[in-house]
From Swiss-Prot:
Family: Belongs to the aromatic acid exporter ArAE (TC 2.A.85) family.
Induction and repression of expression: Positively coregulated with aaeA and aaeX by AaeR.
Designated gene of the protein: aaeB
Membrane topology, from the record: Multi-pass membrane protein
Pfam families, A to Z: FUSC
Role played: Forms an efflux pump with AaeA. Could function as a metabolic relief valve, allowing to eliminate certain compounds when they accumulate to high levels in the cell.
Organism: Escherichia coli (strain K12 / MC4100 / BW2952)
UniProt-recorded name of the protein: p-hydroxybenzoic acid efflux pump subunit AaeB
GO molecular function terms listed in the Swiss-Prot or TrEMBL record: transmembrane transporter activity
Length: 655
């Protein structure tokens, strides 16, 4: 496919984006808004953002959800801007500096919350800065400007949603159904690999792919939830399926690890049974029926606990899968599965990374302020706005540098494109609303195609071009003002990129160490006799951390294996029949406190000291288990955990 070719699957969204822009433009001028540009810009960003992220037409609900986030972020930013102006109107410089800190604070929060919700906080940060900068000549008009901005943005969002609904958005339901079938087959094939106990690298690749696919399925669930309320039952089932899928991965990998020391536990009966290849979900269904008969015949005591647990989880997965596909009423058996353990939310391991993002945003905004005041440039304010936009949006993504480069390319492309519209097209079409709408529809159509291809600079070019062409009421054509705006955008993006390069993010290793220590803490916390604590479901949170570890350290198999071993230890200890008495309960609390100290330690010396203390406590705990005559189901996993911590103590404590 050529660089300028248009694929059939890209046309519908390109028309949708063009429609959203035209609707926003028409409504903006019809209601005599002072700056319809904001409505058009909002419609374009809300519609194109999810398409750029997805690399194609976004699924139903994505545009609507992004629109709601933009409304929330705008209102938070407007309120914050009003509060800052009211409190500091007599000290303009201090007011702008506080706004810079506010933008950094919002970036810090956006780095810690869920990635899909971080957009609202990033927007809240730079919205307040836009308001404070814009009202500098006439501060008394602040409330009016805030209300107008909110109104224009809401109009733009409504237009984007209307265009989305008009062109029958894609439903993700069929993709979810197909993935559920395919995922079950992949789970069975992973168990086959683990029972064969073949090449470790092949097994590592297989479970790593399954972790990614399960995480992707969770993302699909979020999209389905946004799509329509009629999928509420499917959403509940998918949430439980996420835990079941992770349980299947854990039991398969534990089956592999058990054979490293005790291969005789997996009998020939099960080895022969899992030799049968499967290709479809129907094949897996037949095999599971046979497997349940084999277990009923051999008895639970003669069946390895990992295989028994795996079959139970796969059966529940299969039952819920049928419910998701048919979206029928939840029956009593399903309700019993869905009334599972409460999920545990873990503290973010990226606090240092979030603080780096805070300083990047704050310093870049302050640098823009100094540049504006020092040069006295009329478009210094525009440069400041672009700095805030780039840093607020780039920091929450895995590669901020590439986002900044995308904005630089986009603003450079917007200069000649905007020049064409400013000098030729808009002056010749402003007398006719129809011609003006057609001209902007053409812009939206072709850039909509490029956005879906994720062309570098396409998203930045769309936003920057709309931002600099004259879409005010009334239209005024001052070339110097246009040139200042275009150059201000470019300078702002370059300054933001410079700060991102200068303020290095060296938090990767620290984040990795914190993640590994959180796995250790989770394994230690599983040693408890508290009934409520034992019922807590840590599995989704642990695998979410594992997924983050895989993204931070791609290809680092020793780290992944260590993390997976800790997850397996947690699951095994969680179900272990630990003797119930006050002596052990008190010692469990002591070990949890020590594990928390390991995570929160600021220096390597403190971390080593607390980790050494944890190892000593594990030795004492094993002695206590012998005194209280704990069964092998308890002593063996505790012994394995202590051995793992001794083996990897340097990786878990040293920077």
């Amino acid at each position: 496919m050529g660089i300028f070719s248009i694929a059939n699957q890209h046309i519908r969204f390109a028309v949708k984006l063009a429609t959203a822009i035209v609707l926003a433009l028409f409504v903006g001028f019809h209601f005599q808004l002072e700056t319809p540009r904001w409505a058009v810009l909002t419609a374009a960003i809300v519609a194109a953002g999810p398409a750029f992220a997805a690399g194609g037409e976004p699924y139903s609900g994505a545009i609507r959800y992004r629109g709601f986030l933009r409304i929330i972020g705008t209102f938070i930013g407007c309120i914050a801007g009003l509060v800052i102006i009211i409190a500091m109107i007599r000290a303009p410089l201090l007011m702008i500096l506080v706004c810079c800190i506010w933008a950094g604070f919002c970036t810090w929060i956006s780095s810690l919350v869920r990635i899909e919700n971080s957009y609202a906080w990033g927007l809240a940060g730079y919205t307040a800065l836009i308001i404070v900068i814009t009202i500098q000549p006439e501060p008394l008009l602040t409330p009016q400007f805030a209300v107008e901005r909110c109104s224009e943005i809401v109009i733009g969002i409504v237009c984007a949603i209307m265009a989305d609904l008009l062109f029958s958005p894609r439903s993700i339901k069929q993709e979810v159904d197909r993935e559920l079938e395919s995922l079950l087959v992949a789970q069975y094939q992973l168990m086959q690999l683990c029972i064969k106990h073949g090449d470790g690298e092949v097994v590592d690749k297989a479970w790593g792919d399954l972790v990614r696919r399960t995480t992707a399925l969770q993302g699909m669930r979020s999209n389905l939830n946004m799509e329509s309320s009629r999928w509420a039952r499917a959403n509940r089932r998918l949430k439980a399926i996420n835990t079941l899928s992770l349980t299947l991965i854990t039991q398969s990998c534990e089956t592999y690890l058990i054979q490293n020391t005790r291969p005789e536990l997996i009998t020939d009966t099960f080895r022969e049974f899992f030799d049968t290849p499967v290709e479809t979900a129907q094949d897996v269904h037949k095999q599971l029926k046979r497997l349940r008969r084999v277990i009923a015949w051999t008895g639970e005591r003669e069946t390895p606990v990992t295989i028994y647990s795996w079959v139970a989880a796969a059966t529940r997965y299969q039952l819920l899968k049928r419910g998701v596909i048919s979206n029928t009423k939840i029956n009593a058996t399903e309700e019993e599965i869905l009334q599972g353990e409460p999920e545990v939310k873990v503290e973010s391991a990226e606090r240092h990374h979030a603080m780096v993002n805070f300083w990047r945003t704050t310093l870049s905004c302050i640098l823009g302020t100094l540049f504006w005041l020092w040069t006295g440039w009329t478009s210094g304010s525009g440069a400041m706005v672009m700095i805030a936009v780039v840093t607020s949006l780039a920091m929450r993504l895995p590669n901020p540098r590439m986002v900044a480069i995308d904005f630089i390319y986009g603003t450079l492309a917007a200069l000649p494109l905007g020049l064409l519209y400013f000098l030729v097209i808009i002056p010749n079409t402003q007398q006719s609303m129809l011609l003006l709408c057609i001209s902007l529809a053409v812009l939206g159509f072709f850039l909509g195609i490029e956005v879906q291809k994720r062309r570098l600079g396409s998203m930045g070019a769309l936003a920057s071009t709309i931002n600099i062409i004259v879409l005010d009421n009334p239209m005024t054509f001052h070339f110097s003002q246009f040139l200042d705006s275009a150059l201000g955008q470019i300078v702002g993006c370059v300054l933001a990129f410079t700060v991102i390069l200068l303020v290095r993010d060296k938090s990767r290793d620290r984040t990795g160490r914190v993640l590994l220590n959180q796995f250790v803490s989770a394994a230690v916390s599983a040693m408890t006799t508290n009934v409520a604590r034992r019922k807590e479901n840590h599995l989704p949170a642990l695998y979410q951390q594992l997924f983050l570890l895989m993204n931070k350290f791609p290809g680092d198999l020793p780290k992944f294996r260590l993390a997976l071993t800790m997850i397996i230890a947690h699951q095994r200890l969680r179900d272990a029949p630990i003797p119930v008495n006050e002596d052990l309960s008190a010692f469990h609390r002591q070990m949890r406190r020590t594990a928390d100290h390991v995570i929160s330690a600021r220096s390597d010396d403190k971390r080593r000291r607390y980790f050494g203390q944890l190892l000593e406590e594990l030795e004492i705990y094993q002695e206590k288990l012998r005194i209280w005559q704990a069964p092998p189901q308890v002593t063996e996993p505790v012994n394995r955990l202590a051995g793992m911590l001794h083996k990897y103590q340097h990786a878990l404590t040293d920077s």
